[in-house]
Structures are given as structure tokens and as C-alpha cells.
Amino acid sequence: NEVDFDFWRDFRKAVRSEKEDAYILGEIWHDSMPWLRGDQFDAVMNYPFLTAILEMFAKNTITPTQFAEKMTKVYHMYPHTVNMAAFNLIGSHDTPRILTECANNLDKIKQIFTILLTFTGTPCLYYGDEIGLDGEQDPGCRKCMPWEDENQDLELRKHVKSLINLRKEHKVLANEGDLLFVAHDPDVVMYKRESSDSLAYVCINLGKQSKSISLEEWKNA
């Protein structure tokens, strides 16, 4: 982001002249709006999304209510057209594996993937996270992909595949629906996705006991 704006404008024109649907992704750690006005980048890496995920599920430093507040802020940082292309990530080649961050807690990993794949934006899966690959900082997070089924967490892989299929089948879970967090229980992260013709509810139970959620409360939210 130290490169002049005019360079990126010329870069975009050159790239799009070769491939009209090329996806131009930038890496910026602060307010990215100056690069996201339609003449430079299509999206940037959504680090505020990752930060909120880690604070909630890995570090346990925020409550579900605070998580909802942070994610709502993430959602409203940019216009909806920008959010639809947002590069939502839960790990990369520069960070410890999400499984390692969460102390190998697979229940938390499933919950994180549920949020990732029902949130507005472009979900990014770093290779191996979907089959339970672990690892600390580089080089631990860059180990080779284990292709054999016996070396993969097949239950986690099945969970991720089912979420991907849900996102494909129900566009309201992708980018056609608005997103609204609703707080009715201190142990549950809840939000709804709503479009002109569809409505979906996402509930993440962070407690140890089962929960009952009233749809009437959702409708009145």
C-alpha cells in the first residue's frame, strides 16, 4: 500500500484488458476504502474478520455480545458491493494454523467454518485447514498437504463440504442476503441472513448445554 494510487489504476486497466473478470486482491492492514472505489482493488484481505474470530474462539478475550459488535462493525466498514468481494480468511501462510490457534478444539473449528461459510464475502480456505492440518508459525503452517484419507480428519472435511454445498444452494447464505446479528443469549452467537425472498438463521452455541431458540424473538429483532 506504499505504491502510488495512479500505479494501481493503470495496473487494473492493464490486467482487465487481458482478463475482464480478474480478481485483484490487496493486502492492507488499516482502512482500505481509498483502494476500494472501483478503480484499483476488487478486495483486500479481511484481517478485522480474522481478528474477531481469533479473539472469540482462540483467545477467549471477548464475549459473544462483543463478538457480534465487532463483526457488525466489520460488516459496516465498507459498502455492500465491497463486502461481497471481501477476502474473508481464518488463516494463511503467515499465521499459525487455526486448529493450533484453537488448541486442537475441533468443535470450535467447526463453529468457525460455519461463520466463515455463512458470512457475506468471499470465504478463503487455506489448504489443509479443512482436513485438520495443524502447525505453528512458518514453517510449521506451511507443511505439505496430506492427501491420504487416513491422514485427514474426515468428519471435519465432511462438515466443511456440507457448508460449502449449503452456501451454493442457498444464495441468501452467500452474498444475496443482508446480515444482522441478534443477541438473545450470552452463550450464543446469532445472526440472520435475509434477502427479498429468503430468510436463514445461524446460531452458534458456545456453551456446554443445549439451547432452545425462539423464532418469534428473531422475527421481532
Protein language model annotation of sequence segments:
Residues 1-221:
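Active-site and adjacent substrate-binding regions of carbohydrate-active enzymes
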